[in-house]
Curated annotation (Swiss-Prot):
Record's keyword annotation contains Disulfide bond: no
Pfam families linked to this entry: MFS_1
The gene coding this protein: lmrA
One cellular component (GO) term of this entry: plasma membrane
Family: Belongs to the major facilitator superfamily. TCR/Tet family.
Protein's name in the database: Lincomycin resistance protein
Compartment(s) of residence: Cell membrane
Membrane topology: Multi-pass membrane protein
PROSITE patterns referenced in this protein's UniProt entry, alphabetically: MFS, SUGAR_TRANSPORT_1
Stored InterPro entries: MFS, MFS_dom, MFS_trans_sf, Sugar_transporter_CS
Alphabetic keyword roster: Antibiotic resistance, Cell membrane, Membrane, Transmembrane, Transmembrane helix, Transport
GO molecular function, one term: transmembrane transporter activity
């Protein structure tokens, strides 16, 4: 063989080797993305999967509706409160290591939730699931963003799409599993899937170097999480048939102390969890405040409709889960359509329109008789949630008002915390007051809770409209224009 032919053969073989290596790396990235998407799906499913199972959990532990709210709020409060620090921990200890620990904690807590002998241990397990979410989700999103050198945000967008599917899928899975097996399996089913994710991460994700140079503001994160937990506990205690007033008042005072201490810590620490100057922008402040109120109404609607369909309408868990599918699809539809609406009438117009139209609908929904048909139970809910989701997406855009590259991560983290903590606090406060014999009076508990949620929506609309015209909500794209 000539020297030229031999050289050509070597070059050809090297090219094939490089192509094979690149194909193998591409397959590895896709497999990694799939398994990380499975983890995101589990986290998203766990937000809604407990809804249909709530009556079964209540009957299993013989607790009332007010105590039942902890099963939902425990997960979202801890997850939302620690989410801000999750990304910093991933930078400090490495994304791979943080993801492994967070996923393991989520899986172990799912096992504890499925085997919980009483409500107290179930709530503690839900706390653990929330902490696992707060650690694993930012690490997973960071790994996916870094896995593609050409389009890092495409993976993150796919992850967001998976989350939307998970929210809808949670309703259906909850109904099927609760009726055919047991409510415990809505948690136990996570274990084999989390195990697959752990094995995939160990085999496919390379060890990464730590990138953080600044310490984690752990005191700020703990105070930020403790304040809403103490608030919820105090309100729930006030709603008891025989409330322990010293404990309730002490919890509410402790919540106020934690909130004040959080502000003090953030002022003094060199590397705050949330720089207080971030809230100097009134538009961002109003957008996040309105998000809290809107998420409170949205989560309360899901909670109350679950109880209404299975208690008042006497639907089976599967039937209730199927009834929720149109509601979940209306949320996805709103996310698709709201972009065009924002381009036509602006972020302020979309936010106000969504919330203002949802407020009266919330009041009408509260007045539906208990013997109304399934169509009149679900269809108004579809319209209500479609409008509320429109307002929520518009507020999410406004929460990024005037953000720079340096504080973009803080802005998105604060917005997500406002969403999760608002939803948890809304369920706790509105439902506790509505179903309390002392606070709700002789009114129908559903009517009271829905009405309080509607009042919150009206307050959010007024807050947005109170901004001066030059400070009206604007999405990042509108600012550039």
């Amino acid at each position: 063989m000539s020297v030229f032919a031999r050289a050509t053969s070597l070059f050809s073989r090297a090219a094939r080797t490089r192509a094979a290596d690149e194909a193998a790396r591409s397959r590895s990235r896709w497999v990694t993305l799939v398994f990380l998407a499975v983890l995101q799906l589990l986290i998203a499913v766990d937000v809604t999967v407990v809804n249909i199972a709530l009556p079964a959990i209540r009957d299993s532990f013989h607790v009332d509706t007010r105590q039942l709210t902890w099963v939902v709020t425990g997960y979202t409060v801890v997850g939302g409160g620690l989410l801000m620090v999750g990304g910093r921990i991933a930078d400090l200890f490495g994304r791979r290591r943080t993801l492994l620990f967070g996923a393991f904690l989520f899986g172990a807590s799912s096992l504890a939730a499925g085997l919980a002998p009483n409500l107290e241990l179930l709530v503690l397990a839900r706390f653990g699931q929330g902490a696992g979410e707060a650690l694993s989700l930012p690490a997973a999103m960071s790994l996916i963003a870094c896995s593609s050198r050409t389009a890092p945000f495409q993976g993150v967008e796919r992850l967001a799409s998976v989350a939307s599917v998970g929210l809808v899928l949670g309703f259906l899975l909850s109904g099927v599993i609760t009726q055919l097996f047991s409510w415990r399996w809505i948690f136990l089913i996570n274990i084999p899937l989390v195990s697959l994710v752990l094995v995939a991460v160990l085999l496919l994700v390379k060890k990464d170097e730590t990138t953080a140079r600044n310490p984690v503001d752990l005191p700020g994160a703990l105070l930020f999480t403790a304040a809403p937990l103490l608030l919820i506990f105090g309100v729930n205690e006030l709603g008891e048939d025989e409330p322990r007033l010293p404990l309730a008042v002490g919890s509410l005072l402790a919540a106020a102390v934690c909130a004040a201490a959080f502000v003090a810590v953030e002022r003094r620490t060199a590397h705050p969890l949330v720089p207080l100057t971030f809230f100097g922008n009134r538009v961002r402040l109003v957008a996040n405040g309105a998000t809290v109120l809107l998420s409170a109404a949205l989560s309360t609607s899901f909670f109350l409709l679950t109880m209404h369909l299975q208690e008042e309408r006497d639907l089976s868990p599967i039937e209730a889960g199927l009834s929720f599918l149109p509601l979940g699809l209306s949320l996805i539809l709103a996310c698709v359509l709201v972009r065009g609406l924002i381009e036509r009438i602006g972020t302020t117009g979309a936010a106000v329109l969504g919330m203002a139209l949802a407020g009266p609908r919330h009041r009408l929904f509260a007045l539906l008789p208990s013997d109304n048909s399934l169509l009149t139970s679900v269809f108004p809910g579809m319209i209500l949630l479609l409008r509320m989701a429109t307002g929520l997406v518009a507020l999410q855009n406004a929460a990024l008002h005037a953000v720079t590259e340096a504080d973009a991560g803080v802005a998105s983290g604060v917005q997500r915390c406002a969403d999760q903590l608002g939803g948890a606090s809304g369920i706790a406060v509105y439902v506790s007051i509505g179903f309390s014999p002392h606070l709700g009076g002789d009114w129908d508990p559903f009517t009271v809770a829905y009405s309080l949620a509607g009042i919150g929506l009206i307050a959010a609309v007024l807050a947005v409209l109170a901004l001066s015209p030059d400070r009206r909500l604007a999405a990042p794209r509108e600012q550039e224009d």
